[in-house]
């Protein structure tokens, strides 16, 4: 069953792969899964920080989204912490759970 624990376990168990393949320095979840409020149609909200030398951010985010979508069989929204809009930052970060 897909829930907060199973998502966080997968992300934690695959930190090295995520770093090597997608240049992810930090990863976690926020939103409905982080709050245990997910429903059958809920997407998974992923919060990332990429290595500072990354130049192909769009391509990496797209590839990571597809990788996680295939793993979890859910839609994936990825938010880079460096690009959070000011009005949403507090709301997003208060729910964030990093691995």
Q: Predicted regions span which residues?
A:
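Hydrophobic alpha-helical positions that pack around
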Residues: 29
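Short, aliphatic-rich beta-strand segments
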Residues: 43-49
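Catalytic core of pol beta-like nucleotidyltransferases
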Residues: 1-26, 34-40, 51-99
